[in-house]
Amino acid sequence: MNTSFGSVVPSTNFNFFKGHGNNDNTSANSTVNNSNFFLNSNETKPSKNVFMVHSTSQKKSQQPLQNLSHSPSYTENKPDKKKKYMINDAKTIQLVGPLISSPDNLGFQKRSHKARELPRFLINQEPQLEKRAFVQDPWDKANQEKMISLEESIDDLNELYETLKKMRNTERSIMEEKGLVDKADSAKDLYDAIVFQGTCLDMCPTFERSRRNVEYTVYSYEKNQPNDKKASRTKALKVFARPAAAAAPPLPSDVRPPHILVKTLDYIVDNLLTTLPESEGFLWDRMRSIRQDFTYQNYSGPEAVDCNERIVRIHLLILHIMVKSNVEFSLQQELEQLHKSLITLSEIYDDVRSSGGTCPNEAEFRAYALLSKIRDPQYDENIQRLPKHIFQDKLVQMALCFRRVISNSAYTERGFVKTENCLNFYARFFQLMQSPSLPLLMGFFLQMHLTDIRFYALRALSHTLNKKHKPIPFIYLENMLLFNNRQEIIEFCNYYSIEIINGDAADLKTLQHYSHKLSETQPLKKTYLTCLERRLQKTTYKGLINGGEDNLASSVYVKDPKKDRIPSIADQSFLMENFQNNYNEKLNQNSSVKPQINTSPKRVATRPNHFPFSQESKQLPQISQSHTLSTNPLLTPQVHGDLSEQKQQQIKTVTDGGSPFVFDQSAQNSTVEASKAHMISTTSNGAYDEKLSSEQEEMRKKEEQRIEEEKTQLKKKQENADKQVITEQIANDLVKEVVNSSVISIVKREFSEANYRKDFIDTMTRELYDAFLHERLYLIYMDSRAELKRNSTLKKKFFEKWQASYSQAKKNRILEEKKREEIKLVSHQLGVPGFKKSTCLFRTPYKGNVNSSFMLSSSDKNLIFSPVNDEFNKFATHLTKISKLWRPLEMQSIYYDNLTKKFPSNSLTPANLFIYAKDWTSLSNRWILSKFNLQTAQDSKKFSNNIISSRIICIDDEYEPSDFSDLQLLIFNTGVTNPDIFDLEMKLKDDGEELIKLITGISLNTNICFSLLIIYWESAENTLSESTIKHLLKLNRISKNYSSVIERIDLMNLTEESPHKCLEDKLSEISHSYVYKLTERGKYDKTLRQKRSLAGIHSRSTQLQTTKDIDQKMKKMLEKEKNKYQQQIGERNTYAHLESHIDASPRSKKRKLPILLSTSHSSQFKTPLASRLNTSGSSTSPPLPSHLAMKFRKNSRVTSLHTVLPVSTPSHSNNIPAASFSGNNTTDIQSQQLIENQKSTSVYLNNVSERILGNQEICQTPINPVTPVLDGADQGKEDIPDSILELKILIDSVKKKVNND
């Protein structure tokens, strides 16, 4: 090919002249050229590479125009017809423009170049956009009918599958031979690619149905009946099959044609959408299979557009339905297929527009595409390249509005690009979501962003709140952020760790997260809007999916490019290929005929590859061969050698003109005949020379005649062209004159308006300056006054705060001094510190700080002495705020009225109520005092009527067991009762031991069975179960061992919000369920009172000594013995000076004592009497053996006490009733009357001994005292018998055993 110097266009992949596929000049893309203006005309889109030759499906073997070689071996080395070549012709050079206008004048010569093959990476497979006619191969049709008949006739599923499997191998080989499918194991050039078309007329291929029947992968939706084993032919849908690496390509019988795919999707919409949400996975797979079949056939026609659009709508509907339901599904997979469908639609829309067609629903799905990547700024740039009618569409503008409203500069996510137009108008977003004009499917798509929009909305609100701001009510969040209910708000707040106040408000200041995605945490479940759900209920799924305009019925889809535009270079090349092929075929018919090469320097100056033709001509390939030869000087025969230069110039003028040149049929035939005659004359024999010369002469004359006619036509055309030039010149002059006058008037008017505007602006400037200056001075004056006022107010407030701080500091200093003195006093008394162990290591004591372990210095007063936070109950703050909690109880109506009914009405019975607490100064104990209408712990309340008399008494560790004779109810406070508790379990264990000690004293003195109410103050941090509390307090042991004196045990856990109500209910329950019973001591006292009443003892003026005196004597005796015993141990113990430290330790009861201090093995095999006598140095004679230490025999004689002793002859009775005890329980038979009243009564040894002591004291008289056993050294003012001492030691051993258990 001959080209001019510097005019060859480089064949690169850089599309310098490639524009955007847009046919409209819109305001949105006015600066962007629609197509390559160099190589395209009439605003049509070029190929994907401007230098690529277009290929058509009608003819595969096409060869572009190229220069024929001078060598006769050209026919052997000619280029392959199936390949594509780069175009560097004169037309392209003329459009681009050469570097030099006429290189020949400068001595340059044209060089011939071989056509370069088009690179493979520039070859594109054009999709089919027009509707395709369905054509099925007869053999394939017969084969599918045979497969269907076999499916109906064979019932065995395995046999059917094997039969069809064998037929499939034959089918593949025949399809490969027919060229309907590519071979499985052979590589194939892209030039030889086939146009694949599916031929399956069912919604699921026959072979796949058979295979799935064997594999048991048929869904219930694909069967006629749920119990069927075979898939129904009318209901089965083809599954998606992921292509394997080495798998064979699908057969035509496995792929459904476009009209069957439309039918399949219609079936899904009409019959399966109502089965959602259970069928979500099934529909997801079947819709993906539909899109896969379109891809197999490389089909982008109307059916593909319709199916992909409806698939997008179905995915949007599924997103809403699945979020609304509780069925688990993969949101990521649904969004992935939705995005892929939108990308496929965008590519089809671009291809259709480049071909001159339109799609009626493009704007709707362009809007969905904008929402698919709602924070990607690249989509904003792409949408501006679309035509105006799409960019200005209502749906596209609405999608752009949502993109702007949702944009948020605080959004943090990997790959997110922050832009300058981030609005975060979350309130406007939720207003638009409630608008009825919002399309329903678009609303479903936007619902996917509800969680992050709500999160960043609350985060923005949290930045606007100060520390004193109240929590945001739930009703405000529900209305502003469209939460469906309060439960949804609570779940949202709990997920993002937002504190909820009183169950109806959220403290946004506690929001600490910066992103809506929490690391290592499952995402929050997607939610939906009820306003959209209500709109969905008013429509049907089918109507929602099939909405929009029908693509299949659209009259305008793809326009014919041949009718609407002038053919481009690629089309011209295609025409030249057809002509060149025809010429080569005719040239090869006679290999001996060779054209004569003209070596004359005079050549026709026509441009190669320029073939003017009529736009309306439909027979484009039929171009004159003579004209084709004249365009190429290498192929021009001698017959044109005598044309004058003027004729050449005229031909060049015609060639360069804009009007088409039309060849008539006669000229074309004559030229062809002349060419044939000339070629024959070069090879024929001499006999024909004369005949041929005459024919040539005639042809020459005809040619000259034709040229004369052409000259006439050219002359007329030249005249018309001259007229056109003159007309244009006159029109240009008129336009210039009119434009000049108009411009002058416009400029004058603009100048006057500009001057007026300038004067107006100057006047306004002066006035505004004065106004602003006055306003500024006024603001400065007001600021000065405000500053003065503020300073005075601050000084006043500062002084007040200073005075208050001084007073408080003074009080704290006084209190600190007082506490220091108390600690110092206690340290001197106990010898150990009274606070917790320090968490830091103190320095080694030196001479200056000997007492540093017992006193707090000023430098150590801020140290924390415990690694564990102190326990505090839940009501420490709650009790101080609600006044009704402190209101005293109405004990008469709540408790005493019901209790009176339980006591006998024939006498007045005392029934006292004791409240126990270690420290009555704590808040919880003060609350108890307030509820029982007591001011201090020393106060008491009385109640009496004709039946009972009661007193409410408060006790602590310092109590007298003898006061419990008339106890009816014991209230025991435990748990977090003090603010300085650091180990709750240890506290409960100590309280349990104290409770056992207290109940032991009560059991020895009470006359009636009492109720035990334990008030447990729950810890706010360490919550214990009820079973744990009972175990720590040893309630099970208490209920077992003291069942004879305890009527019932109740545990009240104050964990509710209304403790006063809980206390009222518990007291009322105890009063209703109480059963009046006498204890063994009560029964015994009652019997004695009856006996004494019969004997007249009650009439004496001098009453007998009560058991209280004995108790006091026994107590003093125990203290004396204990001190004496401790003194003796201290004399022998080297470590005695450390016992005070051991006793003061809070864990002394829980750890093992050293062997040196342990006394557990000192008297392991001694009786209590022997142990006592060994420690006493004043004893001279062994005491009598204890009658309680003897084991009770089975046939022991029971001393009868039925006969009452006369009062006049009191005597000391040595016949003490026999007592038996087993473990901790004892059984006493006092008399035959007691045996009849209660046959088997189990009581503790302490109770028995107490009654015996009481018996002995009552039966004695002052005249006849008991002879002491001890010697005179132990006889003082308090004469205590040895039997009593022995009994007390035995009681102590039993108590110790009970406590150890």
UniProtKB/Swiss-Prot annotation:
UniProt organism field: Saccharomyces cerevisiae (strain ATCC 204508 / S288c) (Baker's yeast)
InterPro entries: PCI_dom (IPR000717), Sac3 (IPR017173), SAC3/GANP/THP3 (IPR045107), SAC3/GANP/THP3_conserved (IPR005062), SAC3_helical (IPR024293)
Compositional bias segments (type: Polar residues): 54-76
Comment field (misc): Present with 339 molecules/cell in log phase SD medium.
Chain ranges of the PCI domain: 333-524
Modified residues (N6-acetyllysine): 748
Modified residues (Phosphoserine): 568, 866
Chain residue ranges for the region called Disordered: 54-82, 689-715, 1164-1185
Region (Required for targeting SAC3 to the nuclear pore): 573-1301
Protein task: Component of the SAC3-THP1 complex, which functions in transcription-coupled mRNA export from the nucleus to the cytoplasm. SAC3-THP1 functions in docking export-competent ribonucleoprotein particles (mRNPs) to the nuclear entrance of the nuclear pore complex (nuclear basket), by association with components of the nuclear mRNA export machinery (MEX67-MTR2 and SUB2) in the nucleoplasm and the nucleoporin NUP1 at the nuclear basket.
Protein name, UniProt field: Nuclear mRNA export protein SAC3
